[in-house]
Amino acid sequence: MKKENTLLRLIFAVALLLIVNFNVMGDTLRKGGSIVGKIESNGDVRINGSIVGRFESNGDIRVGGSIAGKIESNGDIRKNGSIIGKVEQNGDIRLGGSIVGKVESNGDIRKNGSIIGKAEQMSNVRRVAVMYFFGFFNL
């Protein structure tokens, strides 16, 4: 397990490129900046790069790169690439890639790829497949 975590950190240790401005510990992080670790935001956030670590937002999250870690949002999460880790949110999830980990949603999950792990939702699931080691099940 320790070897896998180290490998994931090496693979996903890339810079975050933030399109919108938001405050991180009193400073404004602009396009071209980078941060690794825990990020909290009260507004909508759009990231062209990847996320490594924990990310919390009260608004929508839009990510262009990969995510390795935990994402929590009270808004929508929109992602085209893959997610490795845990996703919790109260809004909709719209993903074009795959998820490796756990997904908890109070909103709709709209997915074109596969989920390897566990998916729990309180609302509708559209075009979602859950793959386990013992078989393949459509929700």
Task: For each feature predicted by the language model, list its residue ranges.
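Long terminal segments
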Residues: K2-V52, S57-R62, S66-A68, S73-N74, ...
